[in-house]
Regions:
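Hydrophobic faces of well-ordered beta-strands that scaffold small-molecule active sites
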Residues: 142-144, 200-202, 246-248, 336, ...
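Loop/helix patches that line or flank the sugar-binding groove of alpha-linked glycan CAZymes
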Residues: 138, 154-178, 188, 410-413, ...
Length: 577
């Protein structure tokens, strides 16, 4: 047996409570393992530990599995009647049988030895307060990211002197200010609602000298270029009237050059009461020769004008947690995204969650983390992270023509086995953002653009369909993007109306095994009912037998799915009819 391919631990994404009654258990094996059984029971079923008892447990097969590139992910859900569980595994290959315990592998012969210890896996107790709980509304949310300065100018009276004319087309410079503001967002809420959007994610809106606002000057003040507190309150109120949620962007890894505590440090040096609010290794700082790159102090990247905040300092944690609490209590925001979330202290994240969930248990706390983020997703820090690995994997399938539909299956399964199921339900799925090249700019073929969107809309989690160019309102109103808007809106409304598209259960058939560039997967429901997604990424047309109700199609003629064609259909099993 391929022993190196086997792995399990009785915590994190391998063993965790889904709710107060159900425990999910996962184990990875090599492809040589053909069958997995779990032997499980209550730890005290045979008496108190250490009393010479013989504990046997009950054997159950694990039948659900997902294929990874080099391993198989086996999964089962059990209901421990007394909220605790003791277990081990039986692994069967073509010609071998091994038992897998916490301390390793045991042969059948060793199992028969009288008195030999069995160091079983144990989940001690399913404490309700330890169960990761995520906001249920998020999986039903389609987010629209707004970079305020480039979205819509609704109040010219607050335009700064250096504002430039709105540019519907062409490139923009990062430092240019176009005058987009909160009033402009309010004006366009009905447009977003009609599109199918029910969540708005705003990049930072606090006072800052830049247009992007990730170099905050005053965390307690709305940037005057965007409006004021009353305007933002009105935005939240008007959004809520339309059943739309609002999420703010919090920048607590670093601040801007003009943040008052940093200015105090620059003026007073080591005598400043705020000196320990930052990560300074040497004083004075030599800005002329790159103080950050010389290691004199830590910053975001190596930008000297974005000093890194010391979230190890209790005073810093309290200051920013109080700021966030005010956003929730005063503005009634629904979500908070943390910028550069993997660099702030875990203690800050834990304290922030405890405070905000006390105010609003249903608030959505999202971290910007580009890699595997399990250490932040154990139920006591973030609800979710931005699912960059999924978006990049989907785009890679179109970029790398050597990838097959089997590779696609492997990568989707990898993305959805990294975390717990309740986390997967609320991951922030995206194909682009203000930090990346826009998908439409990167994908010259409009058909491929729609194909990638169709795949993403069928994934668990919430979705963001919107680099920093101005919204081309004149072109939109003139109908220049009519087809694109209609197609995206159809996908959004389909996602909203079809529960199976938001579900967790995937199945990857092999109906197109002879054409490796055809993506096919099913989102499973009850009694053979499922939604099937077929995307033809090959260079040839394919035949797709008629079946079920067509929910969405593009470049599909009768039973022929053309190159870059999309077919989404629902098949209802006899038991659901």
């Amino acid at each position: 047996m391929e022993f190196n391919g086997v792995f399990h631990q009785a915590y994190d994404n391998y063993c965790y409570p889904l709710n107060e009654d159900e425990l999910i258990i996962n184990i990875k094996t090599g492809y040589d393992v053909k069958k997995v059984n779990i032997i499980l029971g209550d730890p005290f079923a045979a008496g108190i530990l250490g009393g010479g008892e013989t504990w046997n447990g009950d054997k159950q097969p694990i039948i659900f599995k997902k294929k990874l590139k080099h391993q198989i992910w086996w999964t089962t859900t059990v209901k421990p009647p007394f909220k605790r569980l003791k277990y081990y595994f039986e692994l069967i290959t073509e010609d071998e049988r091994w038992f897998y315990f916490e301390d390793g592998f045991v042969s059948a012969e060793q199992m028969a030895l009288e008195g030999r210890s069995r160091q079983c896996f144990v989940f001690p107790w399913m404490n309700p307060c330890d169960i990761p709980v995520t906001p249920k509304w998020v999986n039903d949310t389609i987010w629209y990211q707004i970079f305020p300065d480039r979205f819509c100018n609704g109040d010219h009276s607050i335009d700064p002197d250096y504002v430039v004319p709105w540019r519907n087309r062409g490139k923009v410079k990062n430092e240019e200010c176009f005058g987009g503001d909160l009033a402009g967002i309010i004006q366009k809420l009905d447009y977003l609602k009609e599109l199918g959007i029910n969540g708005i994610y705003l990049t930072p809106i606090n006072e800052s000298p830049s247009n992007h606002k990730y170099d905050t000057t005053d965390y307690a003040k709305i940037d005057p270029r965007f409006g004021d507190e009353e305007t933002f309150k009105r935005l939240v109120l008007e959004a809520h009237k339309r059943d739309m949620r609002i999420m703010l962007d919090g920048v607590f890894n670093h601040c801007g050059y003009y943040f008052a505590p940093w200015q105090d440090v620059l003026a007073k040096g080591t005598d400043s009461e705020y000196y320990d609010w930052f990560m300074i290794n040497e004083w004075p700082l030599d800005f002329k020769h790159g103080a950050a790159k010389k290691g004199q102090f830590y910053t975001f990247g190596f930008f000297d004008n974005m000093p890194k905040l010391n979230t190890n300092n209790p005073a810093v944690r309290k200051y920013f947690i109080d700021i966030c609490a005010n956003w929730v209590e005063n503005y009634h925001i629904d979500g908070l995204r943390l910028d550069v979330a993997n660099e702030v202290s875990h203690r800050f994240c834990k304290e922030l969650r405890a405070r905000l969930k006390e105010i609003n248990p249903d608030i959505y706390i999202l971290g910007e983390i580009w890699h595997n983020a399990l250490p932040w997703l154990r139920g006591d820090e973030f609800d979710a992270v931005m699912n960059y690995p999924l978006g990049e994997s989907i785009k890679d399938f179109w970029i790398d023509k050597s990838q097959t539909n089997q590779d696609f299956e492997y990568t989707i399964n990898r993305c959805y086995t990294n975390y717990m199921q309740q986390t997967n339900d609320v991951l922030f799925n995206l194909l682009d953002s203000h930090d990346t090249k826009r998908l439409r700019s990167d994908t010259k073929n409009l058909d491929q653009y729609f194909a990638q969107l169709a795949v993403l809309f069928a994934m668990p989690g919430s979705y963001d369909p919107d680099c920093r160019r101005c919204m081309p309102w004149d072109d939109i109103e003139a109908g220049r993007f009519k087809e694109r808007i209609e197609m995206v809106s159809k996908l959004i409304h389909l996602r909203a109306s079809e529960p199976l598209l938001k579900g967790r259960n995937f199945h990857f058939p092999d109906d197109f095994a002879d054409n490796p560039r055809v993506i096919q997967f099913r989102k499973m429901g009850w009694v053979d009912t499922y939604v099937e997604v077929i995307v033809n990424c090959s260079d040839e047309d394919i035949e797709v037998p008629k079946d079920g109700e067509v929910l969405f199609e593009r470049h599909c003629i009768d039973t022929t799915l053309l190159t870059n064609g999309i077919l989404i259909r629902k098949i209802v099993g006899n038991g659901d009819k």
